[in-house]
Amino acid sequence: MPVLIRGDSNMIVMPLSYSASAIARSFEVIEEITIAEKRYLIIFDKKTPRASIVKAELEDVGGELRHVAVAMLELNNQKSIGDNVISVERFWEDSSVLQVEGVCVDRRYQELGFATQLYEALVIKCGVILMSDNTQYEGGKALWQKIAKSSNALSVFILDSDAGLFFPYDGTKAIYDGISIPEEKIWSVHPDVEHFGIVLIAEDKRRIETLTFSNE
């Protein structure tokens, strides 16, 4: 993710919708949330993989009752990282690692924190590790910084995927709080690809606190 591309992502913006049968067939409902007195379902397709937040109440879409999506996450299963092809099992033996390839939120709902809700639900409810992409738009950068600064559920770390080391790259692992590490050490601005190998990692904060306590 650390090559920052100025401007907005070219990802297609919703609306997207799913039939109730499609959700039952392909997705697991991992959480139900209520925001602004409206109910939403967080759904996860582990096989593809992909995740979405959809309205719990069915709506008429082209004459068919469907669950309308308000946010979606495109993901990719990661078995290795970096130019040196380091196995992710070196860092996480008992967790799946999913790389975030794209996140999209309906513009009408962008102030409601749905992207953060998606990240937190996947890590906490499904036990996965989330990894940023190696290229990123400003919106993605802002989202990772927001999660690092404000999330009560997730801890964020900076990983040099080529060297196989976490910041500060001395064998330890420092939590990033959104401001504690200078931006120029994480992101290089396109066309500069100096930090292409740097990725951000989101893990379950409870697990990190448990490991820290056990090592004291």
Question: What function would you assign to each model-found segment?
Answer:
Residues M1-Q110, E120-M131, E138-E216:
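Non-catalytic substrate-recognition and accessory regions of acyl/acetyltransferase enzymes
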Residues Q117:
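P-loop NTPase Walker A phosphate-binding motif
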